[in-house]
């Protein structure tokens, strides 16, 4: 007999998950301890049997990894029980199978029987008095329907109970192969350690263990585990999405941050058209909001231009700099956000807008573009705001094909004066006032910088929007946005490159990852770029390559002798350095600056540690069939040097465990 008390079940599941989490922490600590011995260098631990001992600890690390995977499966299982019960509609149920199968089933039959007997008895009575007072017999249709529904619910509840029970038992058993494998695999490891007096790590036979039939099944077990954990993660996300979608149905959009987080979890494609539009507005401004705080005053003081003109136009058209002032924390993101916001506002107010919105959009766009609100030095280069004559000329040109429009423009001096007044009001602010406002950024909320915030009560400006080429205006705004980007680097008094602000990296297209500094081609700061081979590089705020991730391919790429001979010059390259490729050209690695760093010639050339490591990778790729080689290279720098101090390389060949190699950028590595 089954009894389901969900409250107790969930309480027990929570406790078990907590216990497994504590066990996992212990396993992680054990793994760290084992790995610290396995990774000891020759200078720290060498001599007779040292390699065997380190291999012994290394393979124990693999066993702890298996235990951690097993524990993760258990945690995922116990954490999913609440969702499984909710999916069956049993989230707060108390069910006794015996009661449903017997007492309630019997009650159903008895109720039908009683009603049938009562109806028969009543029919006999009515027949007896029919000649005196004819009456219709009462209908049992409603009763029968309700009784049938109740019985159907009883049966479905039993089915749900059985299904939940079977699902949980089946899923719980999925981790049993892991447990059996771990025990058998560990047994083989013990056997490889020796027997009797020789059963010590110094006699450990790593080859015997790693080539055992049991250990070779490790890859299959890992794939099963990975697939299970992926499914559990997707299930949890789907349940959360359904809950959030239900919440958003009647959401009042009052809290932009809360809406954004919910919508991001749900996924853009699962939002309604209205929700997608609101989400896009938040997305276009959210990433810059963090940059407004903290870095704003510092950037202004160091000579960077304040974001006033174009950013103010996009996020708060018709408003003033008193409402929003910021600074360029990340040039690439600044342009992307501004450009996207321009596109959003164009689609919203020109393509899909009404008379009011089109007039407002064109009036501000014309005023912005024609009066050169954005200069070439930076967003804040707005000392000259243009004249009404320029506005008139531009609008006349746009409307030259329309006599009606021409007439409308001729009489729109009041409109142009209105535009000029609005523009001037937003620009003629002293540096002292801008700095004061930057210090007040702490009070800024995300809602304040959304396009067309409702607090701005703008009247239709009267610009003849029907005679203006909106697409041209939009493209003009976006072009102006692109030229505002400040130079990514400065130059110190000693001639060294000064860094950009430290911000999260952004992804750029390959080919758009270069910048200029002191007339030299350099990499942009804080970016991620990917080659056509799929090799992914990341730079820091100095524009130095800090990491490369790649699934290597055999092939040949062109070398660039100039790039190799100039890497790290003039200050940081050493006399015995080469221009070393992080990904060798034999693996289709780029021959340009985007893959080259100053590297000690001894480690880079034949016989060196870097060279030998590359040969190992090439050998694996040349096998039949070729093995997969995955590499993760990190370049570690000191101070502002453009020359790596050392390299930390993790690589895996085929299904083997990752190997970690540290190579110092010096002779001998």
Curated annotation (Swiss-Prot):
Ranges annotated as biased composition (Basic and acidic residues): 569-580
Comment on bound cofactor: 10 uM Mn(2+) or 10 mM Mg(2+) are equally active in vitro.
TM region positions: none
Disulfide pairings: none
Pfam families: Endonuclea_NS_2, LXG
GO MF, one annotated term: DNA binding
Keywords: Cell membrane, DNA-binding, Hydrolase, Membrane, Nuclease, Toxin
Ranges for domain LXG: 1-235
Main location: membrane
Role noted for this protein: Toxic component of an LXG toxin-immunity module. These modules promote kin selection, mediate competition in biofilms, and drive spatial segregation of different strains, indicating that LXG toxins may help avoid warfare between strains in biofilms. The C-terminus (residues 527 to 669) has DNase activity in E.coli and in vitro, and inhibits growth upon expression in E.coli; does not have RNase activity. Acts on supercoiled, genomic, linear and nicked DNA. By 2 hours post-induction cells have an irregular surface, membrane disruption and elongate.
Subunit structure: The C-terminal fragment is a homodimer. The C-terminus interacts with cognate immunity protein YezG, probably with 2:2 stoichiometry. The second YezG molecules binds with lower affinity.
Family stated for the protein in its record: In the N-terminal section; belongs to the LXG family.
Protein's name according to its UniProt entry: Toxin YeeF
């Amino acid at each position: 007999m089954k009894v389901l008390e969900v409250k107790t079940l969930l309480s027990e599941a929570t406790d078990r998950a907590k216990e497994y989490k504590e066990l996992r922490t212990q396993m992680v600590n054990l793994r760290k301890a084992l790995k610290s011995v396995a990774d000891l260098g020759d200078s720290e631990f060498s001599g007779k049997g040292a390699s065997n001992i380190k291999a012994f600890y290394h393979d124990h690390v693999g066993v702890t990894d298996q235990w951690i995977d097993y524990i993760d499966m258990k945690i995922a299982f116990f954490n999913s029980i609440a969702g499984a019960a909710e999916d069956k509609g049993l989230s707060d149920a108390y069910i006794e199978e015996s009661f449903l199968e017997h007492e309630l089933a019997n009650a159903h039959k008895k109720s039908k029987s009683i009603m049938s007997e009562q109806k028969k008895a009543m029919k006999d009575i009515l027949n007896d008095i029919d000649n005196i007072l004819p009456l219709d017999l009462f209908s049992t249709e409603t009763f029968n329907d309700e009784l049938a529904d109740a019985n159907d619910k009883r049966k479905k509840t039993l089915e749900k109970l059985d299904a939940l029970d079977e699902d949980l038992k089946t899923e719980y058993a999925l981790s049993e192969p892991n447990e059996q494998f771990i025990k058998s695999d560990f047994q083989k490891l013990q056997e490889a350690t020796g027997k009797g007096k020789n059963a010590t790590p110094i006699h450990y036979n790593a080859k015997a263990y790693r080539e055992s039939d049991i250990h070779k099944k490790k890859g299959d077990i890992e794939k099963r585990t990975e697939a299970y954990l992926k499914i559990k993660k997707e299930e949890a996300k789907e349940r959360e999405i359904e809950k959030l979608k239900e919440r958003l149905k009647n959401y009042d959009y009052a809290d932009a941050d809360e809406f954004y987080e919910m919508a991001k979890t749900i996924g853009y494609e699962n939002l309604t058209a209205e929700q997608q539009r609101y989400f896009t507005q938040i997305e276009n401004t959210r990433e810059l909001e963090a940059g407004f705080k903290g870095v704003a005053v510092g950037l202004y003081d160091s000579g960077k231009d304040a974001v006033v003109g174009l950013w103010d136009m996009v996020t708060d058209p018709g408003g003033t700099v008193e409402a929003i002032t910021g600074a360029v924390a990340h040039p690439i993101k600044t342009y992307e956000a501004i450009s996207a916001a321009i596109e959003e506002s164009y689609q919203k107010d020109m393509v899909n807008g009404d008379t009011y919105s089109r007039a407002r959009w064109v009036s501000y766009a014309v005023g912005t573009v024609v009066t050169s609100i954005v200069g070439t030095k930076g967003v804040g280069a707005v000392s000259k705001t243009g004249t009404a004559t320029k506005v008139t000329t531009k609008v006349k040109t746009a409307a030259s094909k329309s006599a009606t429009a021409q007439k409308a423009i001729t009489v729109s001096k009041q409109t142009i004066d209105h535009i000029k007044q609005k523009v001037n009001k937003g620009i003629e602010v002293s540096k002292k006032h801008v700095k004061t406002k930057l210090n007040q950024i702490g009070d800024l909320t995300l809602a304040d910088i959304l396009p067309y915030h409702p607090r701005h009560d703008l009247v239709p400006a009267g610009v003849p929007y029907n005679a203006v080429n909106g697409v041209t205006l939009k493209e003009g705004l976006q072009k102006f946005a692109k030229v505002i980007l400040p130079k990514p680097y400065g130059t110190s008094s000693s001639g060294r490159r000064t860094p950009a602000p430290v911000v999260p990296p952004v992804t750029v297209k390959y080919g758009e990852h270069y910048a200029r500094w002191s007339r030299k081609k350099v990499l942009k700061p804080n970016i991620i770029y990917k080659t056509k081979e799929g090799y992914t590089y990341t730079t820091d705020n100095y524009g130095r390559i800090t990491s490369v991730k790649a699934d290597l391919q055999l092939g040949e790429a062109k070398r660039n002798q100039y790039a190799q001979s100039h890497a790290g010059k003039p200050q940081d390259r050493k006399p015995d350095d080469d221009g070393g490729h992080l990904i060798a050209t034999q693996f289709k690695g780029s021959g340009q600056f985007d893959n080259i760093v100053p590297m000690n010639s001894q480690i880079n050339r034949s016989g060196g540690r870097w060279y030998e490591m590359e040969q190992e990778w090439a050998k694996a790729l040349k096998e039949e069939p070729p093995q997969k080689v995955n590499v993760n290279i990190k370049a570690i720098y000191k101070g502002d040097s453009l020359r790596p101090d050392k390299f930390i390389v993790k690589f895996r060949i085929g299904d083997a465990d990752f190997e970690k190699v540290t190579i110092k950028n010096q002779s001998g590595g």
